[in-house]
Amino acid sequence: MNIFEELKTRGLVFQTTDEQALVKALTEGQVSYYTGYDPTADSLHLGHLVAILTSRRLQLAGHKPYALVGGATGLIGDPSFKDAERSLQTKETVLEWSDKIKGQLSTFLDFENGDNKAELVNNYDWFSQISFIDFLRDVGKYFTVNYMMSKDSVKKRIETGISYTEFAYQIMQGYDFYELNDKHNVTLQIGGSDQWGNMTAGTELLRKKADKTGHVMTVPLITDSTGKKFGKSEGNAVWLDADKTSPYEMYQFWLNVMDDDAVRFLKIFTFLSLDEIAEIETQFNAARHERLAQKTLAREVVTLVHGEEAYKQALNITEQLFAGNIKNLSANELKQGLSNVPNYHVQSIDNHNIVEILVAAKISPSKRQAREDVQNGAIYINGDRVQDLDYQLSNDDKIDDQLTVIRRGKKKYAVLTY
């Protein structure tokens, strides 16, 4: 099975400009290709991972990746299928975000070894050297307004309004392809299916300005089995930066993937062989309650993104919280595992009766209910049941001198911080 066939089997090919010609190029020799990442935030997220891992698969097959950070296009904003104009960021912010994204990409691509080692490029390097007049004369003349307005990504915005700034975005992305082809012989661009219009602007410019053929391959925008856009947890993006989404949170995200999606996601997001995935699928279907596919998915992706130690820690937090063994975890581990739990800041540990704390931390709705909860054995401090109405919090209840975990019943938590 050649690399293109494997990508198709894994569900990673959505659209190509000329599949037959692309397969021929990929099988006849080394292809230089690129994927672009605009710094619209200070971290990449799971939505970017499909293109990143596809790029890595091609590198493992011997082809040469160029990772383009859009220092210039990030200043403009991509209008593709967006309902409204993006907020423009300052140059300083975009530069800072660009550097962070470069660091994240080095986790997945090999920038050091072999003749196909990855290269990092930033389109600010060439766009900052082009005058507006030169850009209009040397690039703009190859694009008709009719051609630009025919793009689905632009059509959606015509009625609501689109600025010239965003309208020109596709020409800038097209020029990226031309520049990389001219300087590095890049002949293939990879990106999300929502980028098709911008990406084919590049092949159009290559054809008209240089009389060359370029290839485009889009990866699908991933949705779950209900049609919901993939990559968000509780409406928030799942970031690749551990400070924005902890390894534990990422682990839980994958662990909670629906059964109907789990095997498909193993093909897309892991480097397990198709034979290994087929074996996992057989075992998974025989005992879905054991969630083998989800556990494998969580292990593989968290290890890939954050490393084996982070995976082991996330697994340990999961197991200890499930067993109620709060004291077996450090304060930092508890902050990961209980990040969505309400916090109540306590100025001083002194003179805090358990009943008062339960009400103040909104664990119990009233003092009467709090007293009943304590007497009925429903209250736990750091995993230990408390049934004494006169119980006073003390320094012994602090974990790593930072926090105390209170639980009511099986699921209602609060974290006291000091």
Swiss-Prot record:
GO terms, molecular function: ATP binding; RNA binding; tyrosine-tRNA ligase activity
Annotated compartments: Cytoplasm
Coiled coil: none
Annotated binding of ATP, by residue: K232
Pfam families to which the protein is assigned, alphabetical: SYY_C-terminal, tRNA-synt_1b
Reactions accelerated catalytically: tRNA(Tyr) + L-tyrosine + ATP = L-tyrosyl-tRNA(Tyr) + AMP + diphosphate + H(+)
Cellular component, GO annotation: cytosol
Residue ranges of the motif 'HIGH' region: 39-48
Keywords: Aminoacyl-tRNA synthetase, ATP-binding, Cytoplasm, Ligase, Nucleotide-binding, Protein biosynthesis, RNA-binding
Entry EC number(s): 6.1.1.1
Main location, first listed in the record: cytoplasm
Keyword Cell inner membrane found: no
SUPFAM superfamilies in UniProt: Alpha-L RNA-binding motif, Nucleotidylyl transferase
Highest taxon of source: Bacteria
Residues of the S4 RNA-binding domain: 352-418
Class of this enzyme: ligase
InterPro entries: aa-tRNA-synth_I_CS, aa-tRNA-synth_Ic, Rossmann-like_a/b/a_fold, S4_RNA-bd, S4_RNA-bd_sf, SYY-like_C, Tyr-tRNA-ligase, Tyr-tRNA-ligase_bac-type
SMART domains named in the record: S4
Residues binding L-tyrosine: Y34, Y169, Q173
Entry's Gene Ontology BP terms: tyrosyl-tRNA aminoacylation
Role, per record: Catalyzes the attachment of tyrosine to tRNA(Tyr) in a two-step reaction: tyrosine is first activated by ATP to form Tyr-AMP and then transferred to the acceptor end of tRNA(Tyr).
Entry's family note: Belongs to the class-I aminoacyl-tRNA synthetase family. TyrS type 1 subfamily.
Subunit structure: Homodimer.
PANTHER family assigned: TYROSINE--TRNA LIGASE, MITOCHONDRIAL, TYROSYL-TRNA SYNTHETASE
HAMAP family: Tyr_tRNA_synth_type1
The protein, known as: Tyrosine--tRNA ligase
Organism listed in the record: Streptococcus pyogenes serotype M49 (strain NZ131)
Origin organism lineage: Bacteria, Bacillati, Bacillota, Bacilli, Lactobacillales
